[in-house]
């Protein structure tokens, strides 16, 4: 029986497993192929202000529009955003703050045209993003995500990301990102191969490589999605300086849980209850928004406790 199982039955079981894997891959491929082609023009506006007008959005799967309206596994039972109005001026740095799941990341997905709104408009330079094709938006919007993905290629190619930039141009971007010295210390410098998912680099080092990418791209609109989340005390100063260099002369949206990141921003928008409830300078929003005021009070208490502990340790 044992011999029969090994020679006849087990191969059939393995065949069934392989067939199931193939079906799963085909299903995934179909989801990708069903994503609609972005339509629109390639003439990007010279003015880079951003506006959301009466925006409503949910991740509801909708027949032929599939992934365009959320075919990425979100249940779509309720609107993520309702009646959202926000104006970000050309060259301004705007922070989006709010609890996890409030809709901050959804706003930047709509600005980047990862999805289209169900109601309302998203405008760049007065033009509806639906009038712009995706390649045009991709060239003019740079995003530094919370988690940096590195390919199993050289450090040079991970920064260049398919562009024709020279080594000198890549190094100039890396210097602004405060990562050039680290790269030059690697065994093969910029030709050093990156391990699987960047395993040989710390979170802060990967973050600065992502910032170097964005500096090299030099897009007029910049989105920082929790861009300081991977930093640690040893490289926080370098990341702060890198982000300051990156933000120069750009329209910037900052999504942040760390309130310390708000020092980069001109104004703050609070996202809660599926909409934007307050917009203004830090002091204005702190006066009029209970959530924001409480968040800052908690942050300051925690910071004071940390300072006291560090002081006590130093006096011990």
Where are these regions (language model features)?
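ABC-type nucleotide-binding domain
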Residues: 45-316
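Coiled-coil segment of the histidine kinase dimerization/signal-transmission module
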Residues: 32-35, 161
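Two-component histidine kinase transmitter core
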Residues: 35-36, 115
């Amino acid at each position: 029986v044992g011999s029969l199982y090994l020679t006849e039955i087990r191969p059939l079981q393995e065949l069934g497993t392989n067939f199931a894997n193939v079906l799963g891959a085909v299903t995934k491929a179909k989801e990708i192929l069903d994503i609609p082609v972005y339509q629109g023009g390639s003439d990007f506006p010279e003015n880079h202000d951003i506006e959301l007008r009466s925006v409503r959005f949910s991740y509801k799967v909708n027949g032929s529009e599939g992934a365009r309206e959320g075919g990425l596994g979100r249940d779509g039972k309720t609107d993520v955003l309702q009646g959202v109005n926000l104006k970000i001026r050309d060259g301004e740095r705007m922070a989006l703050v709010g609890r996890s799941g409030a809709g901050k990341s959804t706003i930047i997905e709509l600005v980047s045209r990862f999805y289209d709104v169900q109601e309302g408009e998203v405008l760049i330079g007065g033009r509806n993003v639906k009038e712009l094709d995706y390649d045009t938006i991709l060239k003019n919007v740079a995003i530094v995500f919370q988690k940096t993905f590195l390919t199993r290629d050289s450090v040079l190619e991970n920064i260049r990301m398919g562009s024709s930039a020279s080594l000198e141009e890549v190094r100039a971007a890396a210097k602004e990102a405060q990562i050039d010295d680290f790269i030059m210390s690697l065994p093969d410098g910029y030709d050093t191969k990156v391990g699987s998912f960047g395993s040989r680099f710390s979170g802060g080092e990967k973050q600065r490589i992502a910032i170097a990418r964005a500096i090299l791209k030099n897009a007029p609109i910049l989105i920082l999605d929790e861009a300081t989340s991977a930093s640690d005390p040893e490289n926080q100063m370098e990341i702060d300086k890198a982000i300051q260099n990156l933000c120069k002369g750009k329209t910037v949206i900052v999504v942040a849980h760390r309130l310390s990141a708000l020092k980069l921003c001109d104004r703050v928008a609070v996202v809660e209850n599926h909409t934007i409830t307050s917009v203004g300078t830090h002091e204005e929003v702190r006066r009029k928004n209970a959530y924001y005021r409480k968040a800052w009070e908690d942050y300051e208490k925690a910071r004071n406790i940390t300072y006291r502990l560090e002081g006590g340790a130093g006096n011990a």
